């Protein structure tokens, strides 16, 4: 899959943000000339003091004071939240001699989709943090004495004859294995292990369940270590992991449940070790032996219109609503200047055009086309009053005028929150307008591609204005919305449906411009995001991924974090179930059918939500509309009557869109 339309390198006007952090504190100087990740799995390592933990499967890892702490986390669960608990099971450092000066902070010397390398220059330590590695790998670059401390008590401590493997057991039941590329002499007290000066590679792994049957496996694969890994999008609906490895033997890594599902679809020369299991908040991780993985998802074909078509007898009802919705369009009456809400209004109007096309009712199209031009062009031309798109060179990306001086402005867009959400709505409008008016599309193509590349750039060498795949995480196979904010539980994402919509909209833009690589990339990420949504956000009755008390009480996630599962929303409490359903459905579009293809689950979700609509104090009509839309998947007539009685709609939705949805459901 070649990078998308690399001949366009338009950037919006440059600005100097007053709220963005300085990346030079933690990235090595050779990385600073390239765009930098803003929503990545290691983001906490480059924010504030860089000392907040990150979850790098299967360990929580924390860097502070020239030491690196490793935790194989325990887990706490209730009906409201699940989270992994950080306890520094092992802390690795090189004691500072008086001549070395004070301890230094870590530096990131390299990073990739699947790895990050943390250097401690003052200690001669370099950690290869590779996602899914059961081993923590550290390179000691010059002869250096080491210290490994624990908050537990060391109950037993032994080595092999050559002093290249050590086994230690703690009083919390954990057993850890340490491997060295050359003999190392270790001594220990109750809670500290020390070495003489050593240089070479050390690998440390938890022995799962302290079960000796796994020890032979970890021994066998201990010599071959990965230093980096990249996800390659070579063909549609496929992502390939390739690792750079060193030393002899085969490479052992760990796969989460979605990996295993997609590995079985691919043409793989890998061996899955189902008995080797590590616990994870994303489900059990199992061993996989192989230098590269091929993950394949089922093909998903994006469409402008509904998949099965609108029932003929319902055309008149939809046309009546459509005429009224189009009649009320007036760009001069829009009061919001926020990029998110403005984008939703654009996408709402674009839906009206596509529904008119599907109904073969062209009368309303000219008015909607003019509305789209009047609302989109000022953002592309930089003439919008009160806000606009600007370019930040420090990290490499689009920020808004509001966001350049206010970290909370535009929901944190200026610190790289929610980029795929906001920009996805604009891209949807641009795609539809380009479909209607190809000449308009050609005129604004540079700006359109600049917007899409902000979160869909595959190659920073071909387009150095934007980081690689800003929001989509190729290891967990879904996106992160949280940007440059330090969070104890890492990155997070609330609305999966808006993430899906962003990639879907990009694929539609590819269709509008005749850009096959963009169609392929957008469709592939759409399909993967949907797989991730179904795996981790949709909580099915009787599911075993999460604890029983959580699964019994919930049918859909609130906010999903790298290290936590939360039922609450950013904007509403967990009890507002209609909001939890709605934020995982909006914006309602043809792709919604693929997200909610499991009718049995849809029924479970709606029946779980419906009692909340009788809540004292009332429920917003806009949220009710989304609940009724999903009810229409299995009870069309009941949902239709409820939708006809609605008195209001979400800002990105309309009566026309809800009627289109209900009347395009299959009777099967």
Swiss-Prot record:
Glycan attachment positions: 65, 124, 160, 187, 465
Cellular location(s): Secreted, Cell wall
Residue segments, region beta-sandwich subdomain: 2-208
Molecular function in Gene Ontology: endo-1,3(4)-beta-glucanase activity; glucan endo-1,3-beta-D-glucosidase activity; polysaccharide binding
Uppermost EC category: hydrolase
Residues reported in the UniProt entry to bind (1,3-beta-D-glucosyl)n: 422, 494, 498
Protein name, per record: Glucan endo-1,3-beta-D-glucosidase
Organism: Glycine max (Soybean)
Gene name per UniProt: GBP
């Amino acid at each position: 899959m070649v990078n998308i339309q690399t001949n366009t390198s338009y950037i919006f006007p440059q600005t100097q943000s007053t709220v963005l952090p300085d990346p030079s504190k933690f990235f090595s100087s050779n990385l600073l000339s390239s765009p930098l990740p803003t929503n990545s799995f290691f983001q906490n390592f480059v924010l504030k003091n860089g000392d907040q933990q990150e979850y790098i499967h299967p360990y929580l890892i924390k860097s502070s004071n020239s030491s690196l702490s490793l935790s194989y986390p325990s887990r706490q669960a209730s009906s409201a939240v699940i989270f992994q608990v950080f306890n520094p099971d092992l802390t690795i450092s090189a004691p500072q001699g008086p001549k070395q000066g004070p301890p230094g902070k870590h530096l990131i010397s390299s990073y990739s989709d699947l790895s990050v390398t943390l250097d401690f220059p003052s200690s001669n330590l370099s950690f290869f943090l590779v996602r899914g590695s059961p081993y923590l790998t550290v390179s000691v670059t010059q002869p250096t004495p080491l210290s490994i401390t624990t908050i537990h008590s060391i109950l037993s401590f032994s080595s092999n004859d050559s002093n290249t493997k050590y086994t230690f057991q703690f009083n919390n039941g954990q057993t850890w294995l340490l491997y060295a590329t050359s003999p190392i002499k270790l001594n220990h007290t109750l809670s500290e292990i020390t070495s003489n000066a050593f240089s070479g590679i050390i690998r440390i792994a938890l022995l799962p369940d302290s079960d000796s049957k796994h020890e032979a496996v970890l021994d066998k694969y201990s010599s071959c270590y990965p230093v980096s890994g990249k996800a390659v999008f070579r063909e549609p609906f496929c992502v390939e992991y390739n690792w750079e490895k060193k030393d002899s033997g085969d490479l052992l890594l760990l796969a989460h449940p979605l990996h295993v599902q997609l590995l079985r679809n691919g043409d793989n020369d890998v061996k899955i070790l189902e008995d080797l299991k590590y616990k994870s908040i994303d489900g059990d991780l199992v061993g996989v032996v192989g230098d590269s993985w091929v993950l394949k998802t089922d093909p998903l074909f994006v469409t402008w219109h509904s998949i099965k078509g609108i029932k003929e007898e319902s055309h008149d009802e939809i046309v009546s609503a459509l005429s009224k919705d189009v009649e009320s369009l007036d760009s001069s009456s829009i009061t919001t200047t926020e990029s998110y809400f403005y984008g939703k209004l654009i996408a709402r109007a674009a839906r009206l055009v596509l529904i008119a096309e599907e109904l073969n009712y062209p009368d309303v199209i000219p008015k909607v086309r003019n509305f789209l031009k009047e609302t989109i062009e000022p953002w592309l031309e930089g003439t919008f009053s009160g806000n606009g798109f600007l370019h930040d060179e420090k990290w490499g990306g689009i920020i808004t005028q509001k966001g350049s001086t206010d970290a909370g402005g535009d929901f944190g867009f200026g610190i790289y929150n929610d980029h795929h959400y906001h920009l996805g709505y604009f891209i949807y409008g641009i795609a539809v307008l380009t479909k209607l008016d190809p000449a308009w599309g050609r005129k604004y193509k540079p700006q359109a591609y600049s917007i899409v590349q902000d979160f869909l750039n595959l190659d920073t060498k071909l387009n150095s204005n934007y980081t690689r795949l800003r929001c989509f995480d190729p290891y967990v196979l879904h996106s992160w919305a949280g940007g440059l904010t330090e969070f104890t539980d890492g990155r997070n994402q609330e609305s999966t449906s808006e993430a899906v919509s962003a990639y879907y909209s990009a694929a539609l833009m590819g269709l509008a411009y005749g850009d096959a690589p963009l169609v392929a990339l957008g469709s592939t990420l759409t399909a993967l995001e949907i797989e991730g949504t179904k795996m981790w956000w949709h909580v099915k009755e009787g599911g075993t991924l999460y604890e029983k008390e959580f699964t019994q009480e919930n049918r859909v996630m609130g906010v999903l974090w790298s290290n936590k599962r939360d039922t609450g929303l950013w904007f509403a409490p967990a009890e507002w179930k209609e909001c939890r359903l709605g934020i995982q459905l909006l914006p309602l579009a043809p792709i919604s059918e693929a997200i909610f293809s499991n009718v049995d689950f849809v029924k479970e979700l709606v029946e779980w939500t419906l009692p909340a609509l009788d809540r004292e104090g009332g429920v917003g009509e806009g949220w009710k509309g989304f609940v009724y839309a999903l009810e229409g998947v299995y009870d069309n007539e009941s949902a239709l009557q409820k939708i006809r009685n609605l008195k209001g709609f979400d800002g990105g939705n309309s009566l026309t869109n809800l009627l289109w949805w209900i009347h395009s459901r299959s009777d099967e």
